Each structure stands twice: as C-alpha cells, then as structure tokens.
Amino acid sequence: MAMNIRKIHPLLKIMNQTLIDLPAPSNISIWWNFGSLLGLCLVIQIVTGLFLAMHYTADITMAFSSVTHICRDVNYGWLIRNIHANGASLFFVCIYFHIARGLYYGSYLYKETWNIGVILLFLLMATAFVGYVLPWGQMSFWGATVITNLLSAFPYIGDTLVQWIWGGFSVDNATLTRFFAFHFLLPFLITALMIIHILFLHETGSNNPMGLNSDMDKISFHPYFIYKDALGFLSLLILLGILALFLPNLLGDTENFIPANPLVTPPHIKPEWYFLFAYAILRSIPNKLGGVLALLFSILILMLVPFLHTSKQRSSTFRPLTQVFFWILVANMLVLTWIGGQPVEQPFILIGQIASISYFSLFLIAIPLAGWWENKILGLN
C-alpha cells in the first residue's frame, strides 16, 4: 500500500506534522484558540496592508490625501482600510488573551517559546506604532513626536538617537518615509519569528489546563482542533465584520481626522487604546528617564516570569491565591488602560501611580510569594 503523500513529501511532511497529525492534548480549552487566531490576524493584516500600500503615498504633502483617496475612490478601499485599522485592535486583543492564558496556565515555563513570544509582542507594538503615524493626522504626528522624543532621555546618545530616527531636527518627510518602510518590513519579520515560535512549541508540545504531562492522552490536531479553531476563526471574522462595517471609528481618535499641523497641539496626546496601559505607566513617573525605563520594563518583565515561578504546580487551576492575584493583575491592567486615556490631573495621576506600583508588585512580589505560600500549605516543600 502506497504511503500517503502528505507524510513523505519534504514540504507537505512539515505541514502535516504542524497542522494535521500533530499530537495535541485532548483537554485544551478555548483559551488555546488564540495562537491560531493570531496567525489569522497576521494574514488579514498583511493582505489588507499590501492593498493599502498600492494606493498610499509616503509623503507629508500627500499622505493624508492618499488615505482619503483610498476611502473615497478606490474600489472597496474604505472596507480594506477599516479592516486593517480594526484588525490591528483585534490582533492586540488576541495577543493579550494569549499572554494571559500563558500566565495563568504556566505556559511560560517553555522558556524559548515564551521569550520569542515576548519579542513578537515588542515587534507587534513597533509595527502598530509606525503604522499609526502613516495617515499623517494630528494624533499621528504628535504621537510620533512625543513617543520618539522619549529616546532623548537616554544619557549621552539620546539627542543623537532621536535625530537619527527622525532623519532631521523634527518629525518630517524623512520620518514618514522610513516609518512606512518599517511598517512594510516588520510584519514579514513577525511571520519569520512566528514560525520559530511554533517550531520551539513543537519541540516540547502544548501545555494544558492541568499543567500536567499529557503524553498518554493526546489526539490528532485534524479534525478535532481544526474544527475547534474554525469556530474561533468564524467568531473573529464576525466581530471584525461588525467593527469594520458598523463601528469603524469606535476605537480610533477623532483628532486623526484633522491633517497634521506642527503649529497646533491636540488637547490630549494619547496613543491607540492597546498602548494605554504602558502609556499610563510612563506618565506615572515624574522623571523622564525613569518613565522610559518603566515603560520598557512593563513589557520586559514578562521575560522574568519563568524565573519568578516558585510553585511546585505549573498551572494556576488548583491555586486559589495565585488566581486571586492573577485577576487583580487583569483588573489593574484595565485601570491602567483607563488612566492612560485620561488627562494628566488629579485624581488620575494618583490612581495611575498606585496602579503602576501594583502592576510591578504583583509580578515581582505577590505572585511569587503566593506560589511559595501555597507550597507550604500543601506541604510540597
């Protein structure tokens, strides 16, 4: 009997081992859907982005007009743009759920997979930031000015670094051109890293809600998880359709409908909603360099999580105290997101400072202590 071609063909064999005959734990829940949803988001963003790039002009005199032209004159240009803009929001929703799943169920103990995931988050944030500058509206321009100017806080090299990124002495045409180049390039770098992320994951196999070894209880990825992922795909596409068709500007900033004007500062400069938690941490520290470092460590702290794991159990499923701290962390993130969108005045300054201290304390002190205490209670030392 002839061997199935998908099992012997050099290229199809790799696809088969990744998507068809992959042994997967039988008990993984819906929280394991977000990895494949991130892949779908990436494909949607690359395809819509490619079509937008065909009509976009990276020049400060024409960028805003070219986006208007896409929405008014290009066939279904309005739809492509709305899908691309709201697809970015859903990308971040999926990645935040994906990270939260990893934190809750102890997936971070696969260190290589986890660290590449953190690098992917950095790249995704960089891509979204440079992409937000491209329409060249008021918030695009001032957001780019404020965020890039933070680099000047670094001693000695700061000012030179900022001018190097700007390509001059202010955010200008050179800045827009290079940001467009970066925005085009980075998604392909993300794709490459995503493949490496999956490669490392398949070295160890997937984690599961129990946090136990599931080698004795695995099922093939196809058809079981293909259908389960298909349900997630359908749900995401319906949500994206509702956003793009009915509420396209819900998550955007109205300031960005005004063309960029270096002489008029918007009343409140703020990034897109998915950066607000980090922006709140940045603003909560009065010192410029301190704020920049806090902003950086708000993401880099994820790389420390595997080393701060003190519990003898991997997952939080049977650890009630850790669960409490996890949900406090989630609530804390939501508070930071809210504060990031508020003006810099009392009581928002104080709430932001308390939430920022809580954010780092939960990662560095509360959750490791909870793990240690649970070991004591259960006599697992």
Swiss-Prot record:
A ubiquinone binds at residue 202. The keyword Transport applies. InterPro entries: Cyt_b/b6_C (IPR005798), Cyt_b/b6_C_sf (IPR036150), Cyt_b/b6_N (IPR005797), Cytb/b6-like_sf (IPR027387), Cytochrome_b (IPR030689), Cytochrome_b_C_euk/bac (IPR048260), Cytochrome_b_N_euk/bac (IPR048259), Di-haem_cyt_TM (IPR016174). Binds 2 heme b groups non-covalently. CDD domains: cytochrome_b_C, Cytochrome_b_N. GO terms for molecular function: metal ion binding; ubiquinol-cytochrome-c reductase activity. Its main location: mitochondrion. It is a multi-pass membrane protein. It is found in: Mitochondrion inner membrane. The chain crosses the membrane at residues 34-54, 78-99, 114-134, 179-199, 227-247, 289-309, 321-341, 348-368. Its cofactor is heme b. Disulfide bonds: none annotated. Heme b b566 binds at residues 98, 197. The cytochrome bc1 complex contains 3 respiratory subunits (MT-CYB, CYC1 and UQCRFS1), 2 core proteins (UQCRC1 and UQCRC2) and probably 6 low-molecular weight proteins. Heme 1 (or BL or b562) is low-potential and absorbs at about 562 nm, and heme 2 (or BH or b566) is high-potential and absorbs at about 566 nm. Belongs to the cytochrome b family. This is Cytochrome b. It comes from Carcharodon carcharias.
